[in-house]
Swiss-Prot record:
The lineage of its organism: Bacteria, Pseudomonadati, Pseudomonadota, Gammaproteobacteria, Enterobacterales. This is 3-ketoacyl-CoA thiolase. Heterotetramer of two alpha chains (FadJ) and two beta chains (FadI). Pathway: Lipid metabolism; fatty acid beta-oxidation. It comes from the Bacteria. Catalyzes the final step of fatty acid oxidation in which acetyl-CoA is released and the CoA ester of a fatty acid two carbons shorter is formed. GO terms for molecular function: acetyl-CoA C-acyltransferase activity. Keywords: Acyltransferase, Cytoplasm, Fatty acid metabolism, Lipid degradation, Lipid metabolism, Transferase.
């Protein structure tokens, strides 16, 4: 085990996470059909600040992320500052780390606090899979640029005459890795085959996720961390996540056909997370500032780690690479954790990572460690369900997970929690949280 790295300021202040909030997550093209990510982000940040009681001018920094970026608002963070009632002097910049984006935003604000340049900051993310940047073909794009430089009507008409009908068709956003051409589902299929994850086990995990998430809502465990969403034209409000199967039946999962490998595959729409719209954010501050304000933190950021692996094979193993580092930096072991929350991009990916947590062979050959970090106690794992049930607005998932784990730790009287996620590009992240 490497030497622990304490996440404190030069004055010895811990990084306090004092509150977190999200809007209900909605399946693509449902409740937020016409609402861009920037408006989802403005909504949650505005409500988060209002509930916190903080004066807007006290917020030094906002770091926010968006994975499916809109060309007209490339710096979503600054647009949120300007549109959510914050002070115009609040520093703001945007980040993107695929599905780990809001983890990165949290880390960035934490590092600003540790550096002494920020006392209070907001971190989060928003994404819309319903309002997408629809592109044009390369031929049309080039022609439009050249037309802008053309000086006469005849020159413009000549340029247009070169175009064919297919050049005028819209281009949807890419759903595959830029460097490999592989879709996320293709990678999930790779992992199912490599680590021998059965269809039955995948379906069982998905069913478990929906059952636990439905129970969490039924018991009122999420009401304080999920706001009511009400967007123009204000005809209806969304109070809960709309992807959760409240009456999930395990046998129904077997009826779906594979979504990626049609002939031999096991990954289906039901054991994968759906395309989702949503936003989430957290407020971080120096521990001494929280005390001065009389604010009781939800918890503290104990450690974090990021990882990167090759993208061609099984690239969604990020949690298996990042978690051992985060545990070492926190000075703890897997057994010390009260809760473990892993992003469920796919049931196959989740189960593969759980296997690698317990694999001594993987630890020796891939991590250079003498032994595995250990087998996960499923009574501690994704106890309120996971992304398969809640949905996955790419940049918002990390902030959802952090807030959810901190609140659950408080209900249990404190302890240590792990949040971890895979991400496109072979990336991964893990954060250790502490509640007293």
């Amino acid at each position: 085990m490497s030497r622990p790295l304490t996440k404190v300021t030069q004055q010895g202040d811990r990084i306090a996470i004092v509150s977190g909030l999200r809007i209900p997550f909605a399946k693509q093209a449902t409740s937020y059909h016409d609402i861009p990510a920037v408006d989802l982000g403005k909504s949650v940040v505005s409500e988060l600040v209002t509930r916190s009681g903080l004066l807007p001018e006290k917020i030094d920094q906002l770091v926010f992320g968006q994975v499916v970026q809109m060309p007209e608002a490339p710096n979503i963070a600054r647009e949120i500052v300007l549109g959510a009632g914050l002070s115009v002097s609040t520093d703001a910049y945007s980040v993107s780390r695929a599905c780990a984006t809001s983890f990165q935003a949290i880390a960035n604000v934490a590092e600003s606090i540790m550096a002494g340049t920020v006392n209070i900051g907001i971190a989060g993310g928003a994404d819309s899979s319903s309002v997408l940047p629809i592109g044009v073909t390369k031929s049309l794009a080039r022609t439009l640029v050249e037309m802008n430089k053309a000086k006469t009507l005849s020159q413009r008409l000549k340029l247009l005459s070169r175009l064919k009908f297919r050049d005028l068709l819209p281009v949807s956003p890419a759903v595959a890795e830029y460097s490999t051409g592989l879709r996320m589902g293709d990678t999930a299929e790779q992992m199912a085959k490599t680590y021998r994850i059965s269809r039955e086990d995948q379906d069982a995990l998905a069913h478990r996720s929906h059952i636990l998430a439905a129970k969490a809502w039924e018991q009122g465990l999420l009401v304080d961390e999920v706001m009511t969403a009400h967007f123009p034209p204000y005809r209806e409000a969304l109070l809960e996540d709309n992807n959760i199967r409240k009456n999930s039946v395990l046998t129904s999962y077997a009826k779906l056909r594979p979504a990626f490998d049609r002939k031999y595959g096991t990954v289906t729409a039901a054991n994968s997370t759906p395309l989702t719209d949503g936003a989430a954010a957290v407020i971080l501050m120096r521990e001494s500032v929280a005390k001065a304000l009389g604010t009781k933190p939800l918890g503290y950021l104990r450690s974090y780690a990021f990882s990167a692996i090759d993208v061609w094979q099984d690239m969604l193993l990020g949690p298996s690479y990042a978690t051992p580092i985060a545990l070492d930096r926190a000075g703890i072991t897997l057994k010390d954790l009260t809760l473990i929350d892993m992003h469920e991009a796919f049931a196959a990916q989740t189960l593969a990572n759980l296997k690698m947590f317990a694999s001594d062979e993987f630890a020796r050959n891939k991590l250079g460690r003498a032994q595995a970090i250990g087998e996960v106690d499923m009574d501690k794992f994704n106890v309120l369900g996971g992304s398969i049930a809640y949905g996955h607005p790419f940049a918002a998932t990390g902030a959802r997970m952090v807030t959810q784990v901190l609140n659950e730790l408080r209900r249990r009287g404190g302890g240590l929690g792990l949040t971890t996620a895979c991400a496109a590009g072979g990336l991964g992240t893990a954060m250790v949280l502490e509640v007293e």
